[in-house]
């Protein structure tokens, strides 16, 4: 018996990440090859983006995806999020030349307050929300705080791109297959302050930390490479990393929906106070997923170097939260 279609809302649907994302959702890569989807696509109420969205929908039609049960174009989050089972909040205001971070936070604050309120009003009560648009952790925090009638656990931020970048660097360093890396995590903010942590990681049961055994490489090569990878891609490509961000969003949502079989992944989730992270802070943590729920990996030892890195990324996040407090 075929499954009932689920509703997937995507914001910024005509943008670069949206374009790299929608065809993969419609083909079944995110929710499984037996799960029909209805795409509810949101773009800003401006002629250019709305017209571009129509073009993307024409292409989606032309793929004749068996799992694409329907799609709709929207310019208002109140209609785009109606009964949504999944919401990928991709659209955000990028930082323009000469724009101060505070200004960026304020502009995005307004966007994510409105979207949080709309989700609160019309989305499924079990909606799974992933914020991709930067600053992702703080935008997710704003959306969560603007949706008091939805469970906090429904809101997540994307740290998976940092996680995948870290895995790829470790695979290159060790000469091993990226698929064999387990128990890797990224703590904190999706920003250059994030802390990619391979102290517990294994490859085919062997310790990655022992394999690499080079703290100087960790502190001076690995962490800066992962932290500044986005900037390096803009420098090389002239555009930001869209396909790899879309891929990370698919990974994050697929694992959350379908489970990780006991494997660790990284998700930005609202803290309940574990590891000394204040409650409600949207923070990257190691989690496992099953039955549509994520579960924090608890009881990991935090050494002095790790604590210093975690404190640094937390401090940045708390500064961002303070910068949007007046909006909430």
UniProtKB/Swiss-Prot annotation:
Give the InterPro entries listed for this entry.
Answer: L-lactate/malate_DH (IPR001557), Lactate/malate_DH_C (IPR022383), Lactate/malate_DH_N (IPR001236), Lactate_DH/Glyco_Ohase_4_C (IPR015955), Malate_DH_type2 (IPR010945), NAD(P)-bd_dom_sf (IPR036291)
The alphabetical list of record keywords is: NAD, Oxidoreductase, Tricarboxylic acid cycle
Q: Which SUPFAM superfamilies match?
A: LDH C-terminal domain-like, NAD(P)-binding Rossmann-fold domains
Signal peptide region = none
> What's the domain of life for this entry?
Bacteria
Residues involved in substrate binding: 95, 101, 134, 165
Q: Which residues form the active site?
A: 190 (proton acceptor)
Instruction: Drop me one GO molecular function for this one.
Output: L-malate dehydrogenase (NAD+) activity
Q: Where does NAD(+) bind?
A: 12-18, 108, 115, 132-134
**Membrane-spanning parts:** none
The answer to whether the entry has keyword Oxidoreductase is: yes
GO BP of this protein: malate metabolic process; tricarboxylic acid cycle
EC number(s) of the enzyme?
Answer: 1.1.1.37
Catalytic activity from the UniProt record: (S)-malate + NAD(+) = oxaloacetate + NADH + H(+)
What's the family? Belongs to the LDH/MDH superfamily. MDH type 2 family.
Report the function annotation for this chain: Catalyzes the reversible oxidation of malate to oxaloacetate.
Q: What is this protein called?
A: Malate dehydrogenase
Source species of the chain = Polaromonas sp. (strain JS666 / ATCC BAA-500)
């Amino acid at each position: 018996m075929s499954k009932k279609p689920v509703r997937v809302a995507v914001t910024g649907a005509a943008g670069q990440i949206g374009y790299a994302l929608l065809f993969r959702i419609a083909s079944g890569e995110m929710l499984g090859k037996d799960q029909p989807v209805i795409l509810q696509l949101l773009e800003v109420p401006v002629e250019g983006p709305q017209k571009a969205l129509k073009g993307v929908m024409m292409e989606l039609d032309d793929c004749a995806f068996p799992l694409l049960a329907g799609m709709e174009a929207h310019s208002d989050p109140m209609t785009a999020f109606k009964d949504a089972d999944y919401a990928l909040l991709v659209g955000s205001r990028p930082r323009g030349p000469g724009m101060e971070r505070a200004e960026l936070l304020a502009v995005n604050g307004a966007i994510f307050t409105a979207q949080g309120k709309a989700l609160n009003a019309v989305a499924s009560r079990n909606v799974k929300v992933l914020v991709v648009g930067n600053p992702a952790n703080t935008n997710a925090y704003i959306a969560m705080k603007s949706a008091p009638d939805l469970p906090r656990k429904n809101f997540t931020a994307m740290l998976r791109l940092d996680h995948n970048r870290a895995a790829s660097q470790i695979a290159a360093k060790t000469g091993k297959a990226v698929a064999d890396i387990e128990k890797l995590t990224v703590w904190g903010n999706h920003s250059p302050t994030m802390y990619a942590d391979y102290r517990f990681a294994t490859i085919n049961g062997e310790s990655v930390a022992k394999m690499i055994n080079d703290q100087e490489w960790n502190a001076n090569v690995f962490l800066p490479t992962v932290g500044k990878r986005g900037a390096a891609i803009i420098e090389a490509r002239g555009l930001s990393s869209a396909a790899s961000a879309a891929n990370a969003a698919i990974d994050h949502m697929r694992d959350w929906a379908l489970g990780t079989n006991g494997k660790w992944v990284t998700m930005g989730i609202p803290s309940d106070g574990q590891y000394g992270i204040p409650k409600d802070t949207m923070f990257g943590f190691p989690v496992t997923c099953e039955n549509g729920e994520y579960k924090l990996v608890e009881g990991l030892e935090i050494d002095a170097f790790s604590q210093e890195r975690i404190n640094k990324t937390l401090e940045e996040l708390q500064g961002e939260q303070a910068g949007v407090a007046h909006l909430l």
